[in-house]
Amino acid sequence: MISALFSNILVLCGLAVIAAILLYITSQKFKMEKSPIEEAIYNALPHANCGACGKAGCQDFAVACFKADQEEFESLKCPVGGSAVMTKIADLKGMKTGTMQKTCAVLRCNGTCKNAPDKVEYTGLRSCRAANTVMSGRSGCPNGCLRFGDCVKVCQFGALSLNKETGIPIIDYTKCTSCGKCVQRCPRGLFEIRPIEEGQQVYVACRNQQKGAVARKNCTAACIACGKCAKINPEIIVENNLAYIPTTVSAVADGEKLAAECPVKAIHYRQNMQENKHEN
């Protein structure tokens, strides 16, 4: 009985070895040799595999760069590596790279513990996604930050952290690569990737679409859709009780004035972003 079992085990092991050898031979026979240039392109990439470029990962992006003609190549961008990496790849291909505008994530909410105090106690799983399924919000704002830091957990570059005093995320502009993981993760769509214009940004830090009086009861920093910003720049959209500043609006030309004129300080204007690392 034992000898028969032992024989069966040996047969199975033998078959496994034979199968492994056959698989190896087959893989070598049909192996696709990489071009030295394609290999060099892959090695030039940051290997973050974040998907911010729109491809499955760095290997997929390297293949796309290698196969691209001049027009296609100019449309390819590596947000993590930036212009330095794309210039290196362009040199390898003997092509010109497209222009890359610096961008970073912004949090379109200023629902801090002070501006939007808790009105309900949440005792469930400490996750934004979990909390979002069972309640409108700790402060009563149905669109505000839930303050559990799901975004922080998915940021692989250490660009996000929770401010213990305010309760909302802090963005380190020097580390943000615009990979978009925070945009995908936030159940309330509070993150947006926006351009940095000469070290400046301007945006509305609110997504509450309740009427002004109601919104202000839940958060003192809520947009009241007064329309003052739209009078400064007609490109600004005010609808559904909320203002939105398109990325075509110049932060350099209008940013400071827009922030100063906003009566509830819902418009945030950032400057000297090369030196100032954090959003407060």
Range-by-range predicted roles:
Residues S250-E256:
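Surface-exposed, short loops/turns at beta-strand junctions within beta-sandwich domains
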Residues I2-P169, Y173-K175, K181-G227, I232, ...:
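Ferredoxin-type iron-sulfur electron-transfer modules and their immediate structural context
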